[in-house]
């Protein structure tokens, strides 16, 4: 349980054995409509010391926003590509949203498949990625809560109102 959404989300991820990295390389590739929103997530992760990798379009948006990023090929663009990095154990986290286009869906499938086999955490929505990012930032501050005490506090509030 968490008091904030981010805290609850991180605890839910940890409880289901989803790994939230504290360092390493992160791959980000998002559809055009998500690029502006992905910038804030990328900036936060870069400030935490993560090395960011992205496909050309996402990398261009990140570079324009002043974020350091390394370009990696899509699967269809040839090797070396992101699936190679995943299989080599080089990627800690993946943020990938796709447009409804056959080649994008095919690339996304191969990335998801490699990530699943390598047990790399993978987010397909910016909401999930944002919550994970906030969780990574605040992970050191996670607390255990006594449910009985919280129940008493809620009852006291009800009585007071």
Where do the protein language model's features map onto the residues?
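ATP-dependent carboxylate/acyl-activation modules
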Residues: 1-121, 129-132, 138-161
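Extended, alpha-helix-rich binding/interface surfaces that flank or overlap catalytic cores
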Residues: 125
């Amino acid at each position: 349980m968490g008091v904030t959404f981010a805290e609850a989300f991180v605890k839910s991820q940890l409880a289901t054995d989803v790994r939230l990295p504290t360092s390493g390389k992160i791959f980000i590739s998002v559809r055009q409509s998500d690029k502006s929103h992905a910038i804030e997530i990328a900036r936060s992760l870069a400030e935490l010391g993560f090395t960011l990798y992205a496909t050309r379009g996402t990398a261009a948006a990140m570079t324009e926003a002043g974020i350091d990023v390394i370009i990696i090929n899509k699967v269809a663009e040839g090797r070396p590509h992101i699936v190679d990095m995943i299989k080599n154990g080089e990627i800690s986290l993946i943020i990938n949203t796709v447009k409804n286009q056959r080649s994008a869906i095919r690339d996304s499938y191969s990335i998801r498949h490699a990530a699943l086999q390598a047990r790399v955490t993978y987010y397909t929505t910016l909401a999930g990625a944002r919550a994970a990012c906030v969780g990574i930032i605040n992970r050191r501050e996670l607390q255990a809560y006594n449910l009985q005490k919280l129940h008493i506090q809620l009852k006291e509030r009800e009585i007071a109102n």
